[in-house]
Amino acid sequence: MKPSPVKSTIDFEQDGLQHGFLKLPHSHDESAYGSVMIPISMVKNGEGPTALLTGGNHGDEYEGPIALFDLARTIDPRQIRGRVILVPAMNYPAFQAGKRTSPIDSGNMNRSFPGNPEGSITEKITDYFQRTLLPLAEWVLDLHSGGKTLDFLPFCAAHRLEDKQQEQRCAEAMRAFNAPYSMMLLEIDSVGMYDTAAEAMGKVFITTELGGKGTATAETVRIAKRGIRNFLIHAGILEGSPELSPSIHLDMPDQRCYIGSESNGLLEMKVNLGEKVLEG
């Protein structure tokens, strides 16, 4: 396979705090020699584990980018042991456009793994994550929310996996994140997902859904920031004690947990998110 066309402007082995870009050449009508410039930050202090923290996998989900851009600005290298790689907006073209998918190639990044160094813009970005960034990390956190089309109770999720020891490590990280809701989830459409790529490499991987409706609230951003800190403490990278509060544990073990309409029409909500309902 050919080398990735994506080039990083930061040195992944250098101690200290660095801010830079993942630079991907992209010739288009407005710039013959243009590039997609994806912000990336890294903080490193000696030897230790590596965490890869990502947001903006879908461009209309804002809690991750807000929390990670803030962390990149405020993190102190003296407070960590190891390395933290931050990519606040993985699909940066989609993030700039406020769209779920890329305006360049309509690529859904979370259905484009493992990517292709000779493919579309989205496939070239996912290939760089697959072959360069994911192999650097033992711990992976991908922050999502509902975007413009969904609304969620704020939860952190770990997946049901064939490797039960890996599943247990992921579940422990999910509980450490300490969102208001903690979910064990069996993905029913996992082909091409970032999640699947990370888990296939044996990583400790967790993800979130922190609201939606195409916006971010002060509360969901607070949940993201607190959860990131707790995750890094749990990974043994960040100093300090976790900030914990009660979390409701949920389980989505199979396809019965998904109910879709088979017809068009007007939807009237009878209950709000989080309300208890009876079967039948």
What does each of the following model-derived ranges do?
Residues 1-279:
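Structured catalytic-domain cores with a bias toward divalent-metal coordination
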